[in-house]
């Protein structure tokens, strides 16, 4: 069991130091128990050199997105590089992106807190669009079979070798992506995944916690543990230095970073991500990842049974009706996770 850190938070002023959403994610029954050590989000990497050569632009709505996909495929390349070998829950990465980008973060929030059903049309539509793009159109690595067959090293190599023009992945990829591009002439960059409605709109940055810091309920010296955490939260330079060692794939504490906090040794692409993420999520422009905000059973269902849907054994409507049943059970058993008020 964990010890409440509510008293330490008030003593040291942690709520003022952390990004609002990240602090709220650690509050249970009104008490602060869990401090974020690493945050992450889903992004869209793209081969910048390839885009410039072909005059392609980052899509901002569904029409532009599907038009770009056709243009990429007409060049004999895959739209995205990605795969699930070695980590079956990879499916939830893409599933969460579509739920937020198609149904919208406001609707996802309402479903998380029980004000909407997961079987509502906007969620069924999101899952069906993903099924179409994955199974029918082969956006990811050319086909569903290829997607299932590729692992971490495979899809990074495919992206770097122009086998695919883009890659949907989390920000934990920064270090690996930088490494696979360092010896080639092409350059890469990142963009938020587009809003998949017809009219487009501002894309959302999905909130996710990779690792957290807490105090063991049986700790013999909780005061010392709290002092260590306070030292981390109040020393941006040290946090950035440690995170930079991992090219910001780990130890990315969600502090309120500003331009002046970064040294010249930080990758400009990563720096832009950290500043943009802090600014946009601070304004409330954020969505939700399944591995941070979904309870256990629905969280497994969203990726495990996705394969049943993709195999054509059930419809998107049936898939989301089953998902809603698991959420009802989780609420009945008080097994849901805290979601900060939007």
What kind of feature is each model-predicted range?
Residues 1, 76-78, 161-169:
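Alpha-to-beta junction loops
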Residues 2, 172-179, 193-196, 211-296, ...:
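Mature extracytoplasmic/periplasmic domains
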Residues 4-18, 101-125, 179-183, 195-204, ...:
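Short, solvent-exposed loop/beta-turn-alpha elements that line the ligand-binding surface or hinge
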Residues 62-67, 144-160:
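Short helix-initiation/N-cap motifs at beta->coil->alpha
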Residues 69, 113-147:
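Glycine-centered hinge/linker elements that transmit conformational signals in sensory
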Residues 1-42, 57, 66, 72, ...:
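Hinge/lid segment of periplasmic solute-binding proteins
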Residues 27, 112, 207, 269-328:
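C-terminal capping/gating helix-and-loop segments adjacent to ligand/active sites or protein-protein/ligand interfaces
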Residues 12-50, 78-84, 200-206, 285-292:
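A structural signal for short loop-to-beta-strand junctions that line the ligand-binding cleft
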